[in-house]
């Protein structure tokens, strides 16, 4: 059953029809100008608001709303010691697992890079979907392939009142066209992991969800996002998340996370057209 569904996604994910090649001119007009020459030590992401230190794992807990029901949610994000070259830029690989009611709902690897100016870019995602903890298929988008474009996840100097920015674009079946805008700075927020000052609030939305649906993300300096909220009558998921734990993984735990990320890569269909992920040269992780 899983193999059949995976083959279906392969057809959707690759240019086997005109639908994938199509993207609106509106999307093209609002994309960020991407210059691969403006990246140097790009897998070293040390942006104040979006630091990605290999071996760091963050855990969030909260709720989503599905069919009028409040569903417990848990998200575990791990910065691996893997890198991957996408569209000529070396990215760091982040492994993200979403749990609903204690069961894996989605598992994905996400690719980030920092440019010379300090902006953090999103260059793609490979997402696996599970039904009752059983793998049923995957979807992927990678910048520079099949009409997909990189976007900015965090500005080097985020300021209120500045224009919104594209967080990337991926045509169907992924349908990624999110935008971010700086909402507030200098805020205070308390979550189970602690209380934080100088918090930055980013409002995110998508044309696919409509103008009356936004996700609010709260970023603490030196930590990353610590809280997720929502606003708007059109918001369907109504996800709320709070940071509950920040962990520095042991070499063995990091090796296990690396292995899980590589397994996702092995199951992917787009990866036959890109170089494989590699272990960071500076990594001293064990378990090779």
How would you describe each model-predicted region?
Residues 16-20:
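Sec/Tat signal peptide C-region and signal peptidase I cleavage site
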Residues 149-154, 178:
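Short aromatic loop motif centered on NTY/YTY
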């Amino acid at each position: 059953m899983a193999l059949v569904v995976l083959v279906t996604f392969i057809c959707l994910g690759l240019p086997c029809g005109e639908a994938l090649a199509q993207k609106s001119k509106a999307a093209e007009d609002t994309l960020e100008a991407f210059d691969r020459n403006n990246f140097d030590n790009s897998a070293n992401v040390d942006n104040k608001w979006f630091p990605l230190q290999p071996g760091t794992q963050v855990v969030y807990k909260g709720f989503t709303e599905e069919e009028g029901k409040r569903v417990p949610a848990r998200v575990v994000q791990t910065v691996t010691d893997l890198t991957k070259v996408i569209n000529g830029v070396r990215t760091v690989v982040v492994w993200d697992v979403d749990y609903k009611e204690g069961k894996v709902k989605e598992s994905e690897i996400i690719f980030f890079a920092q440019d010379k100016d300090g902006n953090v870019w999103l260059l793609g995602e490979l997402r696996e979907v599970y039904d009752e903890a059983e793998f049923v298929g995957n979807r992927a988008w990678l910048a520079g392939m099949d009409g997909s474009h990189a976007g900015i996840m965090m500005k080097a100097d985020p300021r209120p009142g500045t224009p919104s920015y594209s967080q990337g674009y991926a045509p169907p079946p992924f349908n990624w066209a999110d935008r971010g805008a700086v909402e507030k700075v200098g805020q205070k927020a308390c979550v189970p992991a602690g209380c934080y000052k100088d918090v930055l609030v980013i409002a995110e939305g998508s044309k696919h969800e409509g103008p009356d649906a936004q996700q609010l993300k709260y970023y603490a300096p030196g930590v990353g996002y610590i809280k997720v909220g929502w606003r708007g009558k059109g918001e369907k998921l109504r996800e709320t998340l709070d940071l509950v734990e920040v962990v520095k993984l042991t070499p063995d735990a990091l090796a296990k996370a690396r292995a899980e990320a590589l397994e996702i890569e092995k199951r992917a269909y787009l990866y036959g057209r890109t170089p494989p992920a590699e272990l960071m040269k500076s990594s001293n992780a064990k378990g090779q």
